[in-house]
């Protein structure tokens, strides 16, 4: 039906961008097979092991642009947390100040590889802005990591991070 045509058109239009797709009736075709190149890395012991960052969503959150008055509030929260506001990356943004999502994530206490352990989805071990499937993660598990990071940045600084990939048939629950 028309819904299937629309889904195919959206997927074709967005195929050059990141997407998280779940739900029934959606087939992502024409994207090619995943490549095995770069899937292995050398461990500190000199052994080849699977690279946990191979299957990445790339940059998961956009850099937020906030208004000047909100920026003043954010600076106060950052300063109250004992963080030097002079080192905070900030740039002129359309209609306000653009902040670095990666910096906010780091400063909110989310380190590379969060949550660690055996959880199947995590922040990349190379960059806190990328989410990775460590091999067996479900969409729900990936979005749970994204939710925890988004909520943590919100609680610490009052800045809402917005996903960069288009979420099709799934979502991150709204902030409380």
Could you tell me what each predicted segment is?
Residues 1-6:
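Short, small-residue-biased leader/transition segments that mark boundaries at the very start
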Residues 8-10:
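General membrane topology signal spanning transmembrane segments
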Residues 13-175:
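Glycine-rich, charge-dense phosphate/pyrophosphate-binding loop(s)
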């Amino acid at each position: 039906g028309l819904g299937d045509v629309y889904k195919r058109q959206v997927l074709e239009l967005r195929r050059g961008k990141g997407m998280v797709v779940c739900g029934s009736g959606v087939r992502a075709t024409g994207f090619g097979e995943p490549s095995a190149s770069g899937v292995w890395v050398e461990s500190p012991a000199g052994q080849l092991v699977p690279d946990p960052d191979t299957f990445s969503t790339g940059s998961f959150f956009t850099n937020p642009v906030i208004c000047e008055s909100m920026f003043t509030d954010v600076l106060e929260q950052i300063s109250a947390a004992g963080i030097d506001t002079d080192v905070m990356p900030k740039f002129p943004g359309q209609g306000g100040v653009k902040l670095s999502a990666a910096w906010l994530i780091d400063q909110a206490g989310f380190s590379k590889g969060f949550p660690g352990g055996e959880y199947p989805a995590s922040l990349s071990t190379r960059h806190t802005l990328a989410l990775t499937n460590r091999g067996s993660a479900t969409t729900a598990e990936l979005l749970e990591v994204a939710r925890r990071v988004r909520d943590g940045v919100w609680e610490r600084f009052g800045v809402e991070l917005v996903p960069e990939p288009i979420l099709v048939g799934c979502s991150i629950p709204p902030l409380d």
